[in-house]
């Protein structure tokens, strides 16, 4: 069976999607096809494909779920909101192809609130393989983007303390005017160039989670900076390293990467490698089909069922309504539980 990965194809404002696809490709026996996540129905004529459907969901829910010739492997997925779960068709699709591996706890809670067996997988970019930079390792690299740019004053301060002249590179993608497959080719090349640049640096300072995680995976010293270190979206990185408060940079004496749980990082990398290998071997979701993942399958079903029943009871009793609203859209939850 042929294999595919997916990337953002509509607005093209997230090189992180490309890096997540590369993280899967690192462990595949052959180069995968690349599909447009926002236009998967276009792949209906390509024959049967095993699709690693990790990444961010999504700009346009009207073209979801994917056509039946695609066998989706849902792990390391992130939902920006609960809109994707407002259609019964989508919920049944996820149940059919579950258990679903979520990239973050918020997505996990949304899936469980919809009664979908699910588990926490973290982000696949934590398992990217090291690249060769082709040159001596030197200097400090500052990686940000237009949506979250480090102030010049902060960059200068970091460089002064480290005695390094910082180099800046953008994490933003390019090629918005190109047809999809040309964009895919150029964006993969651009992402690989970024990975090689990270590996050629003594230290990386970044505001981007999909720069920090690849650096951790490849053994590059990295500092993740954010104005709100406790933000839930940062959790896939925060479980491995300390997130530095952007507003307190001037109070730090060191900018070394702080890996809080290196053993956990190595275990996650092995899990990702085993997961992808098992998916290829069984031609589907290994958590559903491989005996090796049977305990995780049972736990995902049990935990999700318990969560679903608890939330349904709370919703009917009017308990913690505001808190529930932060996890899922109350209207869609009410529709599914009546």
Language-model region placement:
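Active-site anion-handling motifs in enzyme catalytic cores
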Residues: 1-338
